[in-house]
Swiss-Prot record:
Protein name: SKP1-like protein 6
Extra information: May be the product of a pseudogene.
Organism encoding this protein: Arabidopsis thaliana (Mouse-ear cress)
Purpose of the protein: Involved in ubiquitination and subsequent proteasomal degradation of target proteins. Together with CUL1, RBX1 and a F-box protein, it forms a SCF E3 ubiquitin ligase complex. The functional specificity of this complex depends on the type of F-box protein. In the SCF complex, it serves as an adapter that links the F-box protein to CUL1.
InterPro entries: SKP1 (IPR016897), SKP1-like (IPR001232), SKP1-like_dim_sf (IPR036296), SKP1/BTB/POZ_sf (IPR011333), Skp1_comp_POZ (IPR016073)
Main localization category: nucleus
Localisation per UniProt entry: Nucleus
Key words of the record: Nucleus, Ubl conjugation pathway
Region entry Interaction with the F-box domain of F-box proteins, spans: 65-85
Gene Ontology CC terms: nucleus; SCF ubiquitin ligase complex
Coiled-coil features, chain-numbered ranges: none
Length: 85
């Protein structure tokens, strides 16, 4: 929603700033968003989310969480928060 809002407000003409979001983190966020846009069965999403978190390195979990927060992706923020060890 944050990116959509910036685009609608013509604030994205020169790019959208993503401070402290590396390409590696952005790719993970995009992967998550693509799956959640396409998939409709909640049970399948829960399985996919579990695998997504299982393969995520603990060292980048906080970075994904911060990106989800900055980009206002509440479901990803909730998922990463619930997987903090």
């Amino acid at each position: 929603m944050m990116i959509k809002g910036m685009a609608e407000d013509d604030c994205a003409d020169n790019g959208i700033p993503l401070p402290n979001v590396t390409s590696k983190i952005l790719l993970l966020v995009i992967e998550y968003c693509k799956k959640h846009v396409v998939e409709s069965k909640e049970e399948d999403l829960k399985k996919w989310d579990a695998e997504f978190m299982k393969k995520m390195e603990q060292s980048i979990l906080f970075d994904v969480m911060m990106a989800a927060n900055y980009l206002n992706i509440q479901s990803l923020l909730d998922l990463t928060f619930s997987n903090c060890r």
